[in-house]
A protein has these predicted regions:
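Cysteine-cluster motifs in flexible loop/terminal segments that predominantly coordinate metals
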Residues: 225-258
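Hydrophobic acceptor-binding patch used for acceptor engagement in glycosyltransferases
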Residues: 267
Length: 369
């Protein structure tokens, strides 16, 4: 029997919209299956108690939250605090999750969604691609889907929550699918750092050494201005090029990156922290994925990240990658998807305590071995 936990966190003055939509979607999804046992959790204290007992492991977890006009849900904040402070005990190990956020304006829904995803991920939770449904107060963010499905905004919201619930119940956070003809996993690592001075690249080298006999690894460098950023072609033009694994602007993205990412089982982004963001080249790489993403299914690929900050903010960079690659580009977010370290001066990465052991552990997480 599969256990589904619905973490339902209404706002203090709830309009009731999310309650009606989520209950209808969950009931419909569960009726399709005869092996689901659903349980509602409506308070942070109850969530923390069950997590502490290990009851939230090897389950499906659907976070459903309303935010107030200030973008806050106090019960959600308590859960975030618990997950972040108990990450080392992995209270959500073996579980998979999805998120629905209902807002009182046009802002803050994605912010809370990404924060929940990151906190749950470091606590052991995996997410399928596109695991977030968010609703602005006027539901105008559902205009495109409403047109596509020939329906109204409310019905588009309702259908999105149902599809997300179905996706969660069907999702299995299994090890990376092997596509190599000789059985090894195909891993694509993308970086833009200087190999001699970059702490993030040196950390990746430590990780890589632990996987060389277990995976087929391809490294692609996109430094020194090789990559032109996305210029925002019309949708039809972008789709046309993407269907042919191309892009109007060509270059290393078309020649090397597109074929490699279509072929890989897992993507590893090596990301030094630049002003609490990925570097310009990595951001251009993410933007240019749009063409190939529109024509190819990334839902069976996983994303991992190696993040090194000189001062702080690695968690912010991790959330940026979650938003861009998992929530937007549809790649799976495996549990503990990011290795996050702080190393300021060149070579400082080697001075971190137990860094080789950490690198070996992260390599095992990537390969699933």
């Amino acid at each position: 029997m599969m256990k589904l936990f619905i973490i339902y966190l209404p706002a203090q003055c709830s309009p009731g919209r999310l309650k009606n939509i989520s209950k209808k979607a969950i009931s419909a999804a569960c009726r399709k299956r005869n092996d689901i046992e659903a349980e509602y959790i409506t308070a942070a204290d109850e969530f923390c108690f069950l997590a502490g007992k290990g009851s939230l492991r090897k389950a499906k977890i659907l976070f459903i939250a309303e935010i107030d006009e200030g973008g806050i849900n106090l019960e959600a904040c308590k859960i975030l605090s618990y997950l972040q402070s108990h990450a080392s005990s992995k209270p959500l190990t073996g579980s998979a999750g999805a998120i629905v956020i209902d807002g009182r304006g046009d802002m803050f829904t994605k912010d809370l969604g990404r924060r929940i995803a990151f906190a749950a991920n470091i606590a052991g939770l995996s997410f399928p691609g596109k695991p977030l449904v968010e609703a602005s107060e006027d539901l105008h963010n559902f205009r495109v889907l409403a047109d596509l499905w020939d329906t109204d905004l409310y019905s588009a919201y309702e259908k999105s929550v149902l599809l997300l619930t179905d996706k969660l119940l069907d999702f299995e956070a299994a090890s990376i699918k092997n596509t190599s003809s000789y059985g090894k996993q195909k891993i694509l690592a993308v970086h833009a750092g200087n190999k001699t001075t970059s702490n993030s690249f040196n950390l990746w080298e430590m990780i890589r050494k632990n996987m060389e006999d277990k995976a087929d690894i391809e490294d692609i460098s996109i430094r020194n201005g090789q990559l032109i950023d996305c210029r925002g072609c019309k949708y039809d033009d972008c789709l046309h090029f993407g269907e042919n694994a191309g892009c109007f602007y060509g270059g290393v993205m078309v020649e090397k990156v597109y074929p490699a990412i279509i072929d890989c089982d897992a993507l590893v982004l090596i990301c030094p922290n630049y002003n609490d963001s990925v570097s310009a080249n990595i951001m251009a790489f993410i933007n240019r994925l749009t063409a190939v993403f529109r024509a190819h299914d990334f839902s069976q690929k996983k994303v991992f990240a190696v993040i090194v900050s000189g001062y702080s903010g690695g968690d912010i960079v991790a959330q940026q990658i979650i938003g861009a690659i998992n929530m937007n580009k549809n790649l799976i977010l495996p549990a503990d998807f990011a290795m996050i370290e702080t190393a300021g001066k060149p070579g400082d990465i080697f001075k971190i305590r137990d860094i080789k052991e950490k690198a070996a552990k992260f390599a095992a997480n990537i390969t699933g071995l």
